[in-house]
Amino acid sequence: MSEPGKHSPLDPLFDTNPWYKDVLGGYRDLRADELISGHQAGWEVDSLCINTAVYLPWLLGQCLKAGVVIKRAVLSHIREAKGMSHTGKPADIVVNATGLGSLKLGGVEDKTMAPARGQIVLVRNECTPMLSSSGTEDGPAEVLYIMQRAGGGGTVLGGTYDIGNWESAPDPNIALRIMKRVVDARPDITGGRGVEGLSVVRHAVGLRPYREGGVRIEEERLDDGTWIVHNYGHSGWGYQGSYGCAEAVVELVERLRRRTGSKI
């Protein structure tokens, strides 16, 4: 945990008495000699890292195995989705999980949505355990984390959390700061050789679907009678919260079906 008065978008994850200490195993407070310089407190906890390059194809395969029909289309209005059912009949219920697209999608146009720009550096160097910090000296939009992916997926060095920034190209100055923060915190990642010892695979930028007020999971009825179940605005925790949010969506859909006799 960084010094007080320096706020980060990730602050809800960091507390001297974190809510998840009794949910995840292996929790312990770090000793003073284990802390990163400039930090007042820290802890260790069992966690996991998802290699998305492996996980997403597997998840798609599970959907296909379950009989899900995949279609690609460009929609200007959410109501257009009701005509895309593989049955050839209009759907009575549409689940909207369009992420950042919900900002401009007709029929939704949620102005509380904004991009939260994230820039990372993917390297071949290995570094365990994972590390995450509540803030840095480089401004409120810049954070520090190190995540080694399983299955030879490289190690992700981060990063940024810049709300309202649409820039999709990596910034070389930010990339240098990311790498410097990482080697300062974990010099062992390069065997003490500094930034020059990092074997960079690529630089990347993603736009997280940030929503002021948090994720939106609720039902809404359009003027034409179509029911929409919204599930968007997960910001940077879409993978972590996906199963819980999906269960909430299923509950809403089933409740609507019982109440209205609708078909999804």
Q: For each predicted feature, which ranges?
A:
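Active-site lid/adjacent beta-loop-alpha segment flanking the redox-cofactor pocket in flavoenzymes
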Residues: P129-E212, R221
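Flavin (FAD/FMN) cofactor-binding and adjacent substrate-gating region
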Residues: M1-G67
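Helical element adjacent to the flavin cofactor pocket in flavoenzyme catalytic cores
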Residues: H39-I93, A97, S102
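Short, solvent-exposed loop/turn segments at secondary-structure junctions
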Residues: K6, L100-S102, D162-I163, S235
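C-terminal catalytic lobe of FAD-dependent flavoproteins
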Residues: D33, G192-I264
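Amphipathic alpha-helical segments that form well-ordered structural scaffolds
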Residues: V54-Q62, R177, R181-A185, A248, ...
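Short, basic/glycine-rich phosphate-binding loops at helix/coil junctions
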Residues: L35-Q40, R124, T155-T160
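Central helical "cap/lid" subdomain
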Residues: H77, A81-T136, S168-L176, A185-E196
